[in-house]
Amino acid sequence: KLDNVLSNSMAILSTNDFLIEYLKPLVNYIQDECSKGNMRYAQEKMSKLCIRTCLNSLYVKLRSSKEDCPRMVIGSLISEYESLDTLMHIIVAQNVGWDITYIGNGVPHDEISYAASTVRAQLVVLAINNPRDIARKIYEIRHIRKNAEKTEDIILIGSQCSEYRQLTNEFNINISNELTAFRLKLERLYSLIR
């Protein structure tokens, strides 16, 4: 039943409205209900599977990008896990016009730097959702910043990105913990690059 509701909503709403006004609140609601014990584990898994299927179909529809658009690498550091939120950020970025290289979750920091230089990315987006290992992740983010080309920007996303506020001034790293702010930052960077 959720599949049908999601499909109908996708057909009616624009991609950004669907993600920001409909899907993100739905994911938050599911997480809240699970944490309160009002939803069974199996129900949560089935709901998230429907949402992931919906996001994958959106991702496939938006995959074609122009040859000359700005490039972005998105992934997460070691000990991080994939989140539906990360997939929503990917779709928002594609909708703005970025060419995305998604390298997945649990990627060593030097491999993220290598991927960014290989595709000549203008932006690296790191998803941080796991509250553990903050000191190690700060070291790894600093390493990525130091090895990045001068033209590369870095944006931290995810539920735990606020824990890294001290990096914003020290290393010129942006933090975006909501989809609307992320979209606005991408649009601004896109206009500066083009």
Model-derived segments and their meaning:
Residues 37-40, 46-194:
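C-terminal regulatory/effector modules of DNA-binding transcriptional regulators
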Residues 1-63:
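Long amphipathic alpha-helical segments
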